[in-house]
């Protein structure tokens, strides 16, 4: 097989970005947004989507100009060994944190709804072990997993939300800015984590067949997930009210569980949601897991990118961290902290780009 055939196409890149963004938020976003008491979470999602698209379009030219290198390599070249090491370590720890958060949510949902008699530790370990297997297979194999799962997920989710629309009441999402602007902007930290995922572009650019299309792929990927989350939140709140959504652990599942469609013999629509979401949530972990793998390979200068010791250590570390939170309240608290860590992560390309610009000005530039 020719080398070019292993490169990611525009559509594969777009699907990877969208799939990594769409995960736990499908089930937990309505509750997180409802905790502020504002029914305008869907507007905050749209606003955040626009903000993050602008941020990405600002730092992508730096990655495009050096499309043969991941951000991990750029950090080491521009910032030097020590600072580059710290930056790369932070990104890796962040990616691992995201994987653990996603894996714990996956374990909680599967254990509660699908495998009630199976210990959650067993469920989590199996999913992490399968994920590590895919991580060892490389970026292209992960892209193929995304390509199979994402379209099915999108179609089934949209169909279920359309069926739910018959329960929608406009009064439940009004007034739009109830509680004033302070209440509206208090939504920002609550919904921040659900935009984590597009950072996989830090390492994806060198794997693209045509890096010139990266801006379009990432912008459309973020836009797709933004619309998906906004519609999900709008319909769930519009069917359940804010007061009910914040008292239910998994509002989306509760809504679909209560769904009845006349003329259709299917009674448990929530099973379709749970099964497709489980596959999507698993796929969502892969992008961040691979990011941590590539970063650690760079940090430890490993020639064998599929080093068995590294993959085993990653599996063990993520498993124990995933099982550390005592309950769901702890999980959601750590999720909020990850949201703030996400803000720091997306400043790193700007910091390295600024250092590179200074080096060029003083005649020590090593990059384009």
From Swiss-Prot:
Family (UniProt): Belongs to the amino acid-polyamine-organocation (APC) superfamily. Spore germination protein (SGP) (TC 2.A.3.9) family.
The record lists its disulfide bonds as none
Membrane-spanning residues where? Answer: 10-30, 43-63, 82-102, 120-140, 145-165, 187-207, 217-237, 282-302, 308-328, 338-358
Q: What is this protein called?
A: Spore germination protein B2
Q: Which UniProt keywords apply?
A: Amino-acid transport, Cell membrane, Germination, Membrane, Transmembrane, Transmembrane helix, Transport
Location(s) in or outside the cell: Cell membrane
Kindly give the InterPro entries that the UniProt entry links to this protein.
Spore_GerAB
Pfam families xrefs: Spore_permease
Q: How is the protein disposed in the membrane? A: Multi-pass membrane protein
Q: What does this protein do?
A: Involved in the response to the germinative mixture of L-asparagine, glucose, fructose and potassium ions (AGFK). Could be an amino acid transporter. Cannot stimulate germination in the absence of gerD and gerK gene products (fructose and glucose receptors, respectively).
> Could you tell me the Gene Ontology terms of the biological process aspect for this record?
amino acid transport; spore germination
Transmembrane helix found in the keyword field = yes
> Which interval of the chain is the signal sequence?
none
Task: State whether keyword Cell membrane applies.
Answer: yes
The record's gene field reads: gerBB
Q: Which GO terms describe its cellular component?
A: plasma membrane
